Structures are given as structure tokens and as C-alpha cells.
């Protein structure tokens, strides 16, 4: 079984990706379990930040690495919070603080203009100097609610309403979310790419 470092310290992402990767034959180890600190996210896009994180983890551990960079893009805010989703309310902000700031920012935005999309970029590096990383992108369309609903998921899930399902992302079962989400989409693309590599 191939050991691969997961270049994230976000426990929500670790849980979600570990459950999605469970059947693929990869021994996924979170970078925090290997004593790897988070890489500085200096990129201007999800792709740049995911590559930075994967390269950092691969350099330190000597293992192949998978990194995720993801976030929420709100149409009415020109794509914000975007790459700053995890630190929208400040560098040390909690998920709840980020969510509260976003709700306050869009409180006067009318319902028909509350479109948003989650984006996830997954990068796989075979080694730290890999010149051809595998890069996969998934996106998930929804609408921002006016208040939180649901207790599942993490981050902005309680205010991300999925019209086709009639629920917020936080109200979905793990199976429903994995089948629909930006991260589930990106991971299926990554697994297909790894099978064909």
C-alpha cells in the first residue's frame, strides 16, 4: 500500500478526503501526524496554493503528496472570499467567525443575487520536484442562505443551499455530500488520473 501525505492541517478536509480515499489502496497520513507545519499560502489561485502545499509536504517527508486548496466564491462579492475563505475573518478565525462575517457582508444582497460556488483543487505530486503534477478541479453551485441550517460538514456548509437537493450542505449525509461536492468531484477526477498514470 502506497503511503501518501495529505498536505492539510484542516481536520474537516482530512475526514472528508480520508473517507473518499478509503477504498483506493492509498495509506493516507495527515501532514500533522508527520510533524509537518502548514505551508505559507502565497499563491493567488487555488491551483498555486495547492501546488505550494503539496510541494512543501513532499519536500519535508520524502513522500508523494496530495494537497487540497478550496474555498467559496460568492458572485455578488466578485468571487470573494475565494482563496481567503479559511481566513476571511482573520488569520486565526474559526469556521463560525468566517461564516458570521460572510453573512454580515451579504445581509443586504437580494435572494436572486446570492449565487455562490465551492471550488476544490486537488494536486498530486509524486515527489517534491515532480514537473508534471496531477491537478484536478471540482466546483459545486449553490445559493447562500440568510442563516445557518444543519450540523454536518464544516466551514460554510450551513449556509450553502443546494437547490436540487433542497438542503444546505450541512444537512446532507456524508454519502450525499461526497456524491455532489466540489471535493468529491475533484477527488474522482484525481483517482481516474492516478488509475491511468
From Swiss-Prot:
CDD domains: HAM1. It holds the Pfam family Ham1p_like. Keywords: Hydrolase, Magnesium, Metal-binding, Nucleotide metabolism, Nucleotide-binding. GO terms for molecular function: dITP diphosphatase activity; ITP diphosphatase activity; metal ion binding; nucleotide binding; ribonucleoside triphosphate phosphatase activity; XTP diphosphatase activity. The keyword Cell membrane does not apply. Its EC number is 3.6.1.66. Its cofactor is Mg(2+). Substrate binds at residues 8-13, 70, 154-157, 177, 182-183. GO terms for cellular component: cytosol. InterPro entries: dITP/XTP_pyrophosphatase, ITPase-like_fam, RdgB/HAM1. The keyword Metal-binding applies. It comes from the Bacteria. The active site is at 69 (proton acceptor). GO terms for biological process: nucleotide metabolic process; purine nucleoside triphosphate catabolic process. Mg(2+) binds at residues 40, 69. Binds 1 Mg(2+) ion per subunit. It catalyses: XTP + H2O = XMP + diphosphate + H(+); dITP + H2O = dIMP + diphosphate + H(+); ITP + H2O = IMP + diphosphate + H(+). Homodimer. Belongs to the HAM1 NTPase family. Pyrophosphatase that catalyzes the hydrolysis of nucleoside triphosphates to their monophosphate derivatives, with a high preference for the non-canonical purine nucleotides XTP (xanthosine triphosphate), dITP (deoxyinosine triphosphate) and ITP. Seems to function as a house-cleaning enzyme that removes non-canonical purine nucleotides from the nucleotide pool, thus preventing their incorporation into DNA/RNA and avoiding chromosomal lesions. PANTHER family: INOSINE TRIPHOSPHATE PYROPHOSPHATASE, INOSINE TRIPHOSPHATE PYROPHOSPHATASE/HAM1 PROTEIN. This is dITP/XTP pyrophosphatase. It comes from Pectobacterium atrosepticum (strain SCRI 1043 / ATCC BAA-672) (Erwinia carotovora subsp. atroseptica).
Amino acid at each position: 500500500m502506497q503511503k501518501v501525505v495529505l498536505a492539510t492541517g484542516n481536520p474537516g478536509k482530512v475526514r472528508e478526503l480520508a473517507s473518499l480515499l478509503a477504498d483506493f489502496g492509498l495509506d493516507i497520513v495527515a501532514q500533522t501526524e508527520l510533524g509537518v507545519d502548514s505551508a505559507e499560502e502565497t499563491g493567488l489561485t487555488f491551483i498555486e496554493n495547492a501546488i505550494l502545499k503539496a510541494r512543501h509536504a513532499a519536500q519535508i517527508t520524502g513522500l508523494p503528496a496530495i494537497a487540497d486548496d478550496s474555498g467559496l466564491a460568492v458572485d455578488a462579492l466578485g468571487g470573494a472570499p475565494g482563496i481567503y475563505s479559511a481566513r476571511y475573518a482573520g488569520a486565526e478565525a474559526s469556521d463560525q467567525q468566517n461564516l458570521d462575517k460572510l453573512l454580515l457582508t451579504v445581509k443586504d444582497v437580494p435572494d436572486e443575487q446570492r449565487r455562490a460556488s465551492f471550488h476544490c483543487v486537488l494536486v498530486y505530486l509524486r515527489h517534491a520536484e515532480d514537473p508534471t503534477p496531477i491537478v484536478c478541479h471540482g466546483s459545486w453551485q449553490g445559493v447562500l442562505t440568510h442563516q445557518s441550517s444543519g450540523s454536518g460538514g464544516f466551514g460554510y456548509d450551513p449556509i450553502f443551499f443546494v437547490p436540487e437537493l433542497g438542503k444546505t450542505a450541512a444537512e446532507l449525509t456524508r454519502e450525499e455530500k461526497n456524491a455532489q461536492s466540489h471535493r468529491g468531484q475533484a477527488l474522482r477526477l484525481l483517482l481516474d488520473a492516478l488509475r491511468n498514470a
